[in-house]
Amino acid sequence: MDDLGIELAPGQTAEINLALEPRLIEIAAALKRGFVLTVDYGRTAQDLYDPEARLRGTLVTYHQHVQTDAPLTLIGRQDITAQVDFTSVASAGEKAGLNTLGLVTQRDFLSNLGLDRLHQQLAGQSLTPRQMQANRAGIKELVRPGGLGEFKVLVQGKNVGSP
C-alpha cells in the first residue's frame, strides 16, 4: 500500500490481494504481444480505501442471493467477494512489463467497441421475436447504469503501442 501512497486510518479494514503481483508476472511473461483485460467491479485505490466511505472494507458474503455480513459462518455454503483495487492491478501489471492503456466502465468499453453496430446487425438476422427480445435484454443488461454497465474494464498491453 506504500507503493500506492495509501495509508489506512486507525481501525480501518481493507482487503489486499497477495497473489496479484505473482499472477500478473506469470501472465505478462506468457504474453509476447497483446492485451490483458481485467473486468470486475471495483474502484481506484483512492476511492476504495477512503475511510469516510469504506472504514470496514468491501468484503461481503452472499447466501442464497441474500447479502450477509458473517464470512466465517456457513463456510462452503456462501459466496465471499470484495471489490477489485484497480490501481493495484495496474501497478502490478506495470511492474510485470505491461502498459496500462485505460480504465473505463464496461458500458463505455462495449460502446467504444461498437455495441450499437452489433445491436443493429442482430436486428438484421433471421431471429424469432423471442430471440430478438432476449438479445436486446442481454445487451441492455451489460451496459445498464447502476448494474453491469458500472463494472470496470482495465486494459493493459504488451508490445501493442499506444491507443
Language model region names:
Residues 1-163:
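Long, Lys/Arg- and hydrophobic-enriched amphipathic alpha-helices
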